[in-house]
């Protein structure tokens, strides 16, 4: 009989809609984990979530972005400044820092640009690295190449330094480099 079929049909439709809402909102969803890279800017880890616009990090302005595919950190008219930690800390093997325009890195009591794997600064622009009381640029047991750009490093301690001079290499190609380390050395501790 049609009069009892209609309420059953509506009842079944309401039950189906309720089940869909439960499935959509109550069941756990899959979260996509972000990838962390061995690169820190002003104490903040660079990840797949923030790598396209690192200027959102406190202490960072201008264009700063990291491309993990070719290990390229691009600085364009950037300022990266911290009073509590390194401006840039890298453990990436083969990191290239491309400088476009004039870029300024500064720290108070920490190394400004510190890295433990080979690093190249390139790109035709200018990089000014300044630390009040630690290394402006620190090749910690690894190699530094400055290629086709201008780098000015200044510190009350070390300008551009290796760790102990046993195996670190410092290469300058078609570049202008100025280093001032008033306390301990302007360029020192390279093999």
What is each PLM-predicted segment?
Residues 22-32:
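C-terminal segment of classical bacterial N-terminal signal peptides
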